[in-house]
Amino acid sequence: EFDKDYHNNVKNILESNTILNSIVSNVSDSNKEIMELLSAKTKLIKIDSLLKIPFKNNYKTKSTLGQDRLVLVSSAAKQFPNNNVLIIDLGSCITYDFISVENEYIGGAISPGLNMRYKALNSFTANLPLLNPKKIDDRIGENTEDSIHSGVVNGIIFEINGTVDYYKSEFKEIRIILTGGDSKFLSKKIKNSIFANSNFLLLGLNYLIELNKK
């Protein structure tokens, strides 16, 4: 039912508006019918390892690079040229992606996201409850629920701060970008100077359309 409604909504948008270009990545959870519809009505640009991108990709396994990561690095390359940039995306997973001042994408890291950590504690243990994310002030949990919140939330904060400190020690004058669905939840807890932008990925998608529409 959801797929049918989704298809109809896309169809209505295309019929009600003049749309010349469209772009598809794994961020949009596309299916075959949607792809066919977009191909018939627009110039469809598919994000893959063959796409024209605004940076040099030095990733050793280009075909396995996540499409959302490629889009985020494209956004950084266009918005902050001639800069060292670390993009931290707080989504289902937490991804770290680094692009150098020479406009070369080096790579980064992937770790479990906020909700994934809560679910893992519940799924892989016998007695720990499944909790919703909660902001906490104390690092020491005085009961089981607070201990889970402390472990998950503070664990991510320590991870991000430690990762940022490492990159700052290796690269001078680095810009730190925080984005993704959980960025607002965690941004105030992170000590390092960070530019937060929840639309960073959307800007990257738009840049790729402009670069590949000709």
Say what each PLM segment does:
Residues I94-I99:
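Short beta-strand scaffold segments in enzyme catalytic cores
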